[in-house]
Design a protein with these regions (language model features):
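Transmembrane-lumen/periplasm boundary regions of multi-pass, lipid-linked membrane glycan transferases
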Residues: 45-58, 82, 88, 203, ...
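Short acidic/glycine- and proline-prone juxtamembrane loop motifs at membrane-interface regions
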Residues: 39, 154-168
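Catalytic lumenal/periplasmic loop and adjoining terminal transmembrane helix
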Residues: 22-36, 86, 250-253, 259-267, ...
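Transmembrane signal-anchor helices characteristic of membrane glycosylation enzymes that use polyprenol
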Residues: 5-42, 50, 57-59, 68-72, ...
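Short helix- or helix-capping micro-motifs
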Residues: 145-150, 157, 177, 201, ...
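Transmembrane-helix motifs of polytopic, lipid-linked glycan transferases
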Residues: 112, 116-137, 174, 178
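Membrane-interface transmembrane helices that cradle and orient dolichyl/undecaprenyl
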Residues: 136, 140, 175-196
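Transmembrane-embedded, aromatic-rich helix segments that form part
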Residues: 196, 210-224, 303-308, 360, ...
Length: 544
């Protein structure tokens, strides 16, 4: 029953290797290809992950006792902004694999080692998607769905970061598959199946707050599918999930009511983040309602869009596909509600990508094998596609994505609906949210022993984290200082990070007489730029 096919294992291994090849954030004299630079949240995730893994190693099961939980999770050292499970995986990866990746001996943490945790989560997600699709629809769909997932630049881009998104995607898929398997039949799931489904939902809640979407989806689906017979499985589902969630996060025990509200974002006063959308700056809770739909569509690659369109041409959707559609649409609707914060491009709703991968894979295989579609829905028999057409499609969907995913800035890649990154820039979309362009290739252009002013600075620890965690910055003895936007008092080398939502408009384009010493660009789009300013330099003020 739990035997994994060779094809699913192979595509999962390929997913891991393609992601792991580009985890080099700034190593010195490394054989690893250049990857994305250190991004904004990685330092927090690694630090907290190592802290939790060390605590687990020190206390073992006693970590889940009241006194030890208070010492560990009540400490000022602990940061409860996210549930612990995703960070534990990153911390375990760091502790277990640091010895494999040399070059970070002088830094506080080995960032590439922690990034391997995301690569592993991505590979397991690919395995689950491939195996489920294979068992449900056949080997061709399983492989094609996996290829669709691997070929999504934003998905594999996040898999190269010590971020929570890849682990969240894994937990989301793990919690979604029992629903697709047991909750799409004519009869409702058994009590055992409902409890297991609920436990996996609890694991998802322990990974990231997006887990709160799933029970709403389950209630809507079950009510429509089973009517009054949904009451029993829903009750067991909810109880099991809640128990796993509370039992797995001892921080909740310290002050249950207030801490659960903090988890849900009801009591936490967090700083406002900003989006750059069609040439305008929006606060995260004031973005137009269509932001999630537009960002998703313009971020999807051509092969995914084509697969989805092919599936839409076949009018009949089976129950599994209908539930997959619901798992895509509902999170997008939530983030479209006025006042709900949304930022960082597709990051917050990246959980919809695995479902889209299955639907796109299904679209391609139904197009290549019309007889399968006809048999599945009792339609008239149609002729099979010629072998050369199938071979051409398989070659295209496996080879074409490589150019787009095997690049350091895959996480900032736009799709064909904007004609790529250049077209997205012309439309007024954000260049990059994560400062991932500050990688080895960029830092090698910065003079040694230099003091560099930086703008904008996204949080108070950003520059210290770069100095502490990026080996090439230490090796070249580069000192980073926040620029206070006063040319007469602070002048010299100035690093402009093109996060357009935070970069002052007058700094996005510079006067022609200013020297550009280093630049990170792709397809004509600027992501970061090092210039030299004098005390007499003045930038023309523009409205933001």
């Amino acid at each position: 029953m739990f035997r994994i096919s060779a094809s699913s294992s192979i595509v999962a291994l390929v997913a891991f290797l393609l992601a792991a090849m580009m985890i080099n954030h700034g190593l010195v004299d490394s054989d690893l290809p250049v990857g994305p630079g250190l991004t904004l949240d990685e330092s927090f995730n690694i630090d907290q992950g190592v802290y939790l893994v060390d605590a687990l190693g020190q206390h073992g099961p006693l970590l889940f006792t009241s006194s030890v939980a208070r010492d560990v999770f009540g400490s000022d050292r602990y940061l409860p902004d996210h549930p612990p499970l995703g960070r534990v995986l990153l911390g375990m990866s760091h502790q277990l694999t640091s010895w494999l990746i040399p070059g970070s001996e002088s830094t506080a943490y080995n960032v590439p080692a922690a990034r391997l945790g995301s690569c592993l989560a991505f590979a397991i997600t690919t395995l689950l998607i491939a195996e489920f699709a294979r068992r449900r629809y056949g080997s061709a769909t399983g492989i094609c769905a996996a290829v669709m997932l691997i070929g999504m630049p934003h998905v594999i881009g996040h898999a190269r970061l010590a971020a929570l998104e890849s682990v969240t995607n894994l937990a989301w898929v793990a919690a979604m598959l029992p629903l697709l398997t047991w909750w799409t039949n004519v009869k409702p799931p058994t009590t055992r199946q409902a409890i297991l489904s609920g436990c996996l939902w609890g694991v998802l809640l322990l990974t990231k707050v997006q887990g709160i979407f799933l029970p709403v989806i389950v209630v809507m689906w079950s009510t429509w599918q089973f009517r009054w017979r949904a009451i029993r499985p829903l009750a067991f589902y909810g109880i099991a999930g809640a128990l796993v969630f509370v039992a797995g996060w001892p921080w909740l025990w310290l002050d249950p009511e207030n801490n659960i509200l903090r988890y849900l974002g009801r009591t936490t006063k967090r700083p406002t983040l900003y989006c750059w959308y069609f040439g305008q700056r929006y606060a995260d809770s004031a973005v137009p309602w269509h932001f999630p739909f537009v960002m998703l569509l313009i971020s999807l690659p051509a092969w995914t869009l084509t697969g989805i369109l092919l599936r839409l041409t076949k009018k009949a959707f089976d129950p599994v596909e209908r539930l997959l559609v619901l798992c895509v649409v509902f999170p997008l609707i939530v983030f479209a509600v006025p006042g709900v914060p949304v930022y960082d491009g597709t990051r917050l709703f990246l959980i919809v990508m695995p479902s889209l991968a299955v639907l796109a894979g299904r679209g391609f295989t139904l197009w290549m094998s019309p007889k399968d579609f006809a048999a599945a829905f009792a339609l008239a028999v149609v002729s099979e596609r010629p072998a050369w057409q199938k071979a051409l499609v398989w070659t295209t969907i496996t080879i074409a994505p490589l150019h787009w995913i095997m690049q350091p800035l895959a996480i900032s890649q736009y799709g064909p609906l904007t004609a790529g990154n250049r077209g997205a820039a012309w439309l007024g979309m954000e260049a990059g949210y994560w400062s991932d362009a500050l990688n080895s290739r960029f830092w090698q252009q910065v003079p040694e022993d230099s003091a560099v002013l930086v703008a904008p600075v996204s949080h108070q620890f950003q520059l210290n984290d770069i100095e502490a965690l990026v080996p090439i910055v230490q090796h070249r003895r580069i000192k980073l200082v926040a620029w206070e936007y006063d040319e007469s008092r602070q002048h010299g080398l100035l690093l402009l990070i093109h996060r357009l939502a935070d970069l002052r408009p007058e700094l996005a384009t510079i006067p022609q007489d200013i020297d550009v010493l280093a630049e990170a660009t792709q397809n004509g789009v600027i992501y970061a730029r090092l210039i030299k300013i004098q005390s007499t330099t003045r930038f023309q003020q523009q409205p933001n």
